Amino acid sequence: MSSSSIEDIKGKSHRLRGSLLESLANPTTGALHESDQTLIKYHGSYQQDDRDLREERRRQKLEPAYQFMIRTRTPGGVITPQQWLQLDAIATRYANHSLRVTTRQAFQFHGVIKRELKATMQAINAALIDTLAACGDVNRNVQVAANPLLSRAHADLYTDAAHLSEHLLPNTRAYYEIWLDEKKVAGAGEEEEPIYGPHYLPRKFKIGFAAPPINDVDVFANDLGFIAVIVDNTLLGYNVAIGGGMGTTHGDPDTWPRVGNIIGFITRADLIAISTAIVTTQRDFGNRTLRKRARFKYTIDDRGLDCIVGEIQQRAGITLQPARPFVFEHNGDRYGWIEGEDRHWHLTLSLPAGRIADTESSPLLSGFRAIAQLGIGQFRMTPNQNVVIAGISPGQRATIDALVTQYGLDTGNRAPTALARHAMACVALPTCGLAMAEAERYLPDFNVKLQPILEKYGLAEKPILLRISGCPNGCSRPYLAEIALVGKAPGRYNLMLGGDQRGQRLNTLYRENITETEILAALEPLLGRYQQKRLPGEGFGDFLHRTGIIALPPYPTHRHVISSTLQA
């Protein structure tokens, strides 16, 4: 669908209402009207179909097996045990008996059919969770450093992020009328949208809050990133980064991934003003003609960073202060038990590609249900698709450990290679309509194929960051990985190499459109050289750059590599 068509749909939607009520009530098809397929994204859902069944249904002269993905808005991925049980029940009753933790700390339900879509939405809201603005050309789910219970400063960070998420919600009542049966009032369909305006944003907008020295949110991959400045356990404010983004288009030199620019420091008091100024600047300056060039990163590159920063400061009425020093050490999760400053404990469990389901080998859904039934602590989703069981007293650890062992919830933590423990993948096939190749379903197989090579060179316990994406949109943030597979066609991938373990450097195309056999053949000699010639503590991506095997990619984003002067 063209940019002009989507802009027309948004502008004529009566503030995201469209004909959704009529589409939902139509019993003759499992699909929505075409324009409503665009609008339902703003309500937190995508219309999809099971691509594994497409050809067979076509032969039977049946319409595709339409279904819906629903995504929650859960800033920072924080939920209570009771909410977990309610989401578990929804997955079992309405979806495909699984919960999917996303790379933005949300949950996704897959396989919901149209006639049960409204009931599913109502059940999610009954859990005091919503899906509003989880998709669409608005601010998406706000990422936050994974565990706000580690310290008072982390708690303040989460509070700021949750406040900003609420501030940037659309003002329309369409969501509540369509899904929760709120009665229409005078002026419905004409509500003022003070932040978004009648056409909302040109494209999606992503925000992340990071707490050095850990960059688990990959803050520089966001349109807007906030890097916490914490001194003596007090959150003073944030370094502000703008213009990150992962999406690109295969073979199109006018599109590229980008890491964000640090533009200065703000105090906590200025968070809402600066965020509003940045979002409205993108609203007014972003490209609404060519959708593939509509993200904030292109607005910055087209108009110039100085121009955009000047506009932001003028709108906010704020002069940005010089950025404060910071250090990122890694962008992964710390598995196992960690003690917080309040002497409560937090257990991080690795989930392969974020999927929580019951299988013969790993009854993960049942296991987390058993922990939630204890009614203690909290659940925290991480930006690396893992789960933290947080806020556990010392006396409760043994009970948690027993359930972890009983249900094999630490299977991911015990994966045979460090690479497998830290790897990420997007959903891709069979539900994502954009997928060109497998990702989530392929990740375990690829890990198995790579394991003998890692063991051969003594690298099984060496952290190497692998990410797989089914298409170049990059939902698994593959362009920051040391090794990335980006889907090109069924069974074929672009092999990207040379990112780092701090989320600060993009990788480079190494081999294009190759098969698994070719991927493994390309990686083996490089891993062998890495084993022989790496420096102490040197990551794989850093090694590839130091030895000249990989250079920075040719697109303009690397004008914006993070300045070493800010690395304290």
Swiss-Prot record:
Q: Which GO CC terms are listed, alphabetically? A: sulfite reductase complex (NADPH)
Where on the tree of life does the source sit, at the highest rank? Bacteria
| Name of protein | Sulfite reductase [NADPH] hemoprotein beta-component
Give the family from UniProt.
Belongs to the nitrite and sulfite reductase 4Fe-4S domain family.
PROSITE patterns associated with the record: NIR_SIR
Tell me the Gene Ontology biological-process terms attached to this UniProt entry: cysteine biosynthetic process; hydrogen sulfide biosynthetic process; sulfate assimilation
- What is the source species? Xylella fastidiosa (strain 9a5c)
Q: Which PANTHER family match?
A: SULFITE REDUCTASE [NADPH] SUBUNIT BETA, SULFITE REDUCTASE [NADPH] SUBUNIT BETA-RELATED
Q: What is catalyzed by this enzyme? A: hydrogen sulfide + 3 NADP(+) + 3 H2O = sulfite + 3 NADPH + 4 H(+)
Co-factor: note = Binds 1 siroheme per subunit. Binds 1 [4Fe-4S] cluster per subunit.
Give me the residues that bind siroheme, please: 475
The record's listing under NCBIfam families reads: CysI, PRK13504.1
Question: Which GO terms of the molecular function aspect are on file?
Answer: 4 iron, 4 sulfur cluster binding; heme binding; metal ion binding; NADP binding; sulfite reductase (ferredoxin) activity; sulfite reductase (NADPH) activity
